[in-house]
Amino acid sequence: TFYASIDHVHADAMFMVALFVEIYQNYSALGEGGAPIKLPDPGRYLDYCTRQREYTSALTLESPVVVEWLDFLRRNGGTLPTFPLPLGGSDIPCTGDLITVKLMDSHDSDRFEAVCAQSGVRFLGGVFACAAIAERELAGVDTYQVITPTTTRSSPAEFMTTGWFTGIVPISVPVEGMSFNQVARAAQAAFDSGMHLANVPIERVLELAASLPGISKPGPGVPMLSYLDIGLPPLNPVVMGQWQDRNGTLYTDLGAANQIGMWVNRRDTGTTVTVAYPDNAVARESVAQYVDMMKVVFLRAAEGRADSVSSPRIPRATV
């Protein structure tokens, strides 16, 4: 049995997955009497940090990328968005918890991908669309607002380098009165057009905007939605497909989960969502409602029943 214990501050999810692939490939090669796998040369994390520091130090409030981030913040009351359902009082400390739910089996995942392709978007665009429609139906939002992480690795060497090569992309998607296809196209466009903002840490934007009225640091309840298909490069679909067969397991220490982290993952057995949330009764109920609605919307889209967005069922909640 191989164990690896890594502080998430020092290694992003892409590296952790690559680590498992490396262990598996080398173990298989040695077990079959072969030589260790020759790995590509890694880069230096210090070089990446130096490059990023030089770039962000040159930014000003007039820099186009900073202006784009500020526009997103202002659409959310001057800060990052908040989860649309109640999460309980933030004044009472609590630990975090996780829930994982299967959204679609492999057959429905394939059908969902086909629907996305017919709409001119990738699976990722459909994921954001389903979350947007779920929020519309649960909380009456007119525009879906969320942040999503993405890798900032830009070379083969960086994909072999230990470190934190991750930024966030702001997503704003109009949803009122629109069909799944329309929402998906808007979501895909929002992601694609905002990818360059991942290289601009939100902390740097807030630092520059410290003197601006109406701009503030985010509080608890910021939603983050991530999508990962383990069958797509640079991951190894053959190796990752055997993850569960090899009893591969990730153990996490959530600590105080003040935010809402959502990870939609697609593999050969289907599509799941894992949600990290504050471990209290209010947040637990809200997350359960949210995930249940997400599943309904995903299946509805996969079955070709993605008509106009339905009217909201309940008013938007205050976190």
Regions found by a protein language model. Give the residues of each.
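Acyl-thioester-dependent acyl-group transfer interface
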Residues: 38, 57, 135-203, 213, ...
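Active-site-proximal acidic secondary-structure segment that organizes catalysis
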Residues: 1-46, 286-300
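Short amphipathic alpha-helices and their capping loops
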Residues: 41-97
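Gly/Ser/Thr-rich phosphate-binding loops and adjoining beta-strand/alpha-helix segments
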Residues: 1-5, 61, 88-155, 166-167, ...
